Structure formats: structure tokens, C-alpha cells
């Protein structure tokens, strides 16, 4: 990864031993290795995310081509891309649609009289406080 040879590694180790000492050197090595591991994980995560986004972009381009050509005379590759894109769109929309539907049903099920009763209770308690 860094293209470091054996003698360069030995030189870095000796300098680290002189600068940090034998007590702090193992802790410093562990810290550096954790940092490098975290950097590698972050780089892999970004790489995976970019490849996913590029795949989505490619699917969208194939869908545009399919719309322009007409749905009748598509190549098998484009047909599979269109189907895959439709499935992805349905899977994305489904959780939001289910949530919106359940919220709508909950809102319809709650009676409005509860709000009116609470307002009346507040008015009565305010009137009682004024009377005292």
C-alpha cells in the first residue's frame, strides 16, 4: 500500500523507539494501526457507495433509452434493467406508502371530541383559578 521496503521499516521503528521510548511505542503502534484500519474501512465504504450509485445511474440511463425506443423493441439487457429498476422503485416506495396509510388510518380512528373535551377542561380549570 505505501510501498515501504524492509530497511525503511527498520529505520521508522528505530526512530519511533528513540522518540517514544519502549513504554509508549506499542500503544502508538496500536493507535496508528487502528487509524489505518478505520481509513481503509471508510475508503471501502465510499467505494461501495460509489459503485452502487453508478449502477443506479446506469439503470436510469437504460430506462431513458427504453422510453425513447419504445417498450416493444427492447434488447433483453434493457428489459432486465427496466424490470430491476421497477422492483427497486417499488421497494423504496412501499415502506413510505405503508407508513402514510397507517398514519392516515390512525388519524381517522381518533375522535375529534377528545380535543374538544381537553379544551373544555382547560377552560374550566382556568375559570376555577380565577374564582379563587
From Swiss-Prot:
Transmembrane segments: 1-21
Annotated region (Disordered), positions in chain: 70-132
Primary localization: membrane
Record bears the keyword Secreted: no
Pfam families per the UniProt record, alphabetical: TatA_B_E
Keyword line: Cell inner membrane, Cell membrane, Membrane, Protein transport, Translocation, Transmembrane, Transmembrane helix, Transport
GO molecular function: protein transmembrane transporter activity
Signal peptide: none
Subunit structure: The Tat system comprises two distinct complexes: a TatABC complex, containing multiple copies of TatA, TatB and TatC subunits, and a separate TatA complex, containing only TatA subunits. Substrates initially bind to the TatABC complex, which probably triggers association of the separate TatA complex to form the active translocon.
Name assigned to this protein: Sec-independent protein translocase protein TatB
Organism: Vibrio parahaemolyticus serotype O3:K6 (strain RIMD 2210633)
Name of the encoding gene: tatB
Amino acid at each position: 500500500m505505501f510501498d515501504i521496503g524492509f530497511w525503511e521499516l527498520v529505520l521508522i521503528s528505530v526512530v519511533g523507539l528513540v522518540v517514544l521510548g519502549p513504554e509508549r511505542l506499542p500503544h502508538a503502534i496500536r493507535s496508528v494501526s487502528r487509524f489505518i484500519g478505520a481509513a481503509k474501512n471508510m475508503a471501502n465504504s465510499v467505494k461501495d457507495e460509489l459503485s452502487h450509485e453508478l449502477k443506479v445511474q446506469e439503470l436510469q440511463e437504460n430506462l431513458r433509452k427504453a422510453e425513447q425506443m419504445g417498450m416493444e423493441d427492447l434488447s433483453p439487457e434493457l428489459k432486465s434493467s427496466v424490470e430491476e429498476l421497477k422492483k427497486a422503485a417499488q421497494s423504496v416506495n412501499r415502506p413510505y406508502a405503508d407508513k402514510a396509510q397507517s398514519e392516515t388510518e390512525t388519524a381517522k380512528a381518533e375522535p375529534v371530541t377528545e380535543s374538544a373535551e381537553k379544551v373544555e377542561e382547560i377552560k374550566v380549570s382556568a375559570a376555577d383559578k380565577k374564582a379563587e
